[in-house]
């Protein structure tokens, strides 16, 4: 939309084609009569509680950085839904909330078991937290967005923490045709079979198995080719 037409009321909008830099192309203008314009842009997650808790935030999404179990940088605090990153559909939020709840419950059960096994049981929150999560203390794998990939959720992976690692991402601008490729060093661990169009308004999803991550050491990179 390059112009809204009307004085006291909306009468029409002018739309234009854009180039690869999202700049309107002169001569492509088209007038579409209408009486209402709805805008849903620039949504930002609300994370005052996250900041107060000392949780590390992703500067791109403005939401918490999480691992593949949706656990934040603060042990025992999990994040999901639009507080984590803006979603396309409520169904996506619901599924992510179910996943976060499952992982949080597993964490709580592990904490309880660790405390029961400890001869010196403590009711101190910080001491209790230190006893949790030991079974998930694998080396973390960084998830790095490259090229047209603007961000990823999660930003880090504990390979053995979940049976399947769900990687979600958005592109920074429209890409007419490309494939998703995920690499570890020189090795391609995932590449989509078919090329397709990518747009920033649609969240993309890739599932990686534990077998695909088995030989990864430090990081994986997510890009389009």
Spell out what each predicted region is.
Residues 9-11, 64, 77, 220:
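Hydrophobic residues embedded in beta-strands of well-ordered beta-sheets
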Residues 52-56, 95-96, 183-187:
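Short, solvent-exposed amphipathic alpha-helical segments in soluble enzyme
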């Amino acid at each position: 939309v390059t112009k809204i037409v009307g004085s006291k009321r909306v009468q029409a909008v002018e739309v234009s084609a854009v180039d690869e830099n999202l700049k309107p192309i002169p001569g492509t203008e088209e007038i579409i009569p209408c009486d209402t314009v709805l805008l849903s842009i620039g949504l930002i997650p609300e994370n005052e509680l996250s900041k107060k808790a000392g949780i590390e935030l992703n500067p791109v999404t403005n939401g918490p950085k999480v691992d593949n179990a949706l656990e934040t940088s603060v042990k025992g605090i999990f994040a999901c839904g639009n507080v984590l990153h803006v979603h396309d559909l409520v169904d996506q939020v619901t599924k992510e909330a179910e996943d976060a709840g499952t992982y949080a419950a597993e964490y709580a059960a592990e904490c309880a078991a660790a405390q029961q096994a400890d001869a010196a049981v403590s009711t101190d929150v910080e001491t209790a937290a230190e006893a949790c999560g030991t079974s998930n203390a694998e080396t973390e794998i960084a998830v790095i967005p490259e090229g047209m990939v603007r961000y990823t959720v999660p930003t880090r992976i504990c390979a053995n923490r979940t049976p399947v690692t769900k990687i979600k991402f958005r592109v920074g601008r429209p890409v007419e045709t490309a494939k998703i490729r995920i690499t570890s060093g020189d090795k391609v661990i995932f590449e989509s079979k078919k090329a397709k169009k990518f747009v920033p308004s649609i969240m993309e999803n890739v599932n990686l198995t534990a077998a695909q991550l088995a030989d990864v050491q430090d990081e994986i990179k997510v890009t389009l080719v």
